[in-house]
């Protein structure tokens, strides 16, 4: 199971720092990472379209907030949306969203199984941690998870 997470995390770390031409790019904002994660959760695949209203409901935000985030994520090449159509992730957007989701799931599992937090508290904490820890720290977390068999 850890190998599955490691694959997504490595892909995430690559996409987070390097563009197709090999240049360094800025990390997607924490808010936009949450949108990508939510779209992956709602769609389940790269090709499954997702409605803006469903994203708004899942995230507890307004449709206007979703529209603003979608515009920004379209401009960064993470998703596609025809004029007033459903939202579909690009390959890069899907990989990034999957990596964030897997990172979140792994941290949640650790907080529940090894730290003893309730599922609800662990979910909230993992959501904060997935954005806050550095890539270097997370690589060390991965190594630790491997050692303890998580």
Language-model-detected regions and their locations in the chain:
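C-terminal regulatory/oligomerization modules of transcriptional regulators
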Residues: 1-18, 124-150
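Short alpha-helical segments that sit at the start of domains
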Residues: 8-37
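N-terminal helix-turn-helix DNA-binding core of bacterial DNA-binding proteins
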Residues: 26-61
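Canonical helix-turn-helix DNA-binding module
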Residues: 52-83, 91
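Helix N-cap/coil-helix junction residues
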Residues: 61, 116-117, 150
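Basic, amphipathic "hinge/linker" alpha-helix immediately C-terminal to the N-terminal HTH DNA-binding motif
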Residues: 85-104
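Arg/Lys-rich, alpha-helical DNA-contact motif
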Residues: 101-129, 134-135
């Amino acid at each position: 199971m850890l190998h599955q997470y490691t694959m997504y995390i490595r892909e995430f770390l690559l996409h987070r720092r390097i563009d197709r031409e090999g240049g360094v790019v800025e990390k997607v904002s924490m808010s936009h990472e949450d949108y990508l994660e939510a779209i992956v959760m709602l769609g389940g695949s790269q090709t499954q379209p997702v409605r803006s209203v469903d994203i708004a409901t899942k995230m507890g935000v307004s449709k206007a907030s979703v529209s603003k985030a979608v515009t920004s994520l379209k401009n960064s090449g993470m998703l596609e949306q025809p004029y007033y159509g459903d939202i579909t992730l690009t390959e890069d957007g899907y990989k990034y969203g999957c990596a964030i989701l897997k990172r979140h799931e792994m941290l949640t599992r650790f907080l529940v199984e090894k730290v003893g937090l309730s599922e609800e508290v662990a979910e909230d904490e993992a959501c904060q941690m997935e954005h806050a820890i550095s890539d270097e720290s997370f690589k060390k977390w991965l190594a630790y998870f491997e050692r303890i068999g998580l």
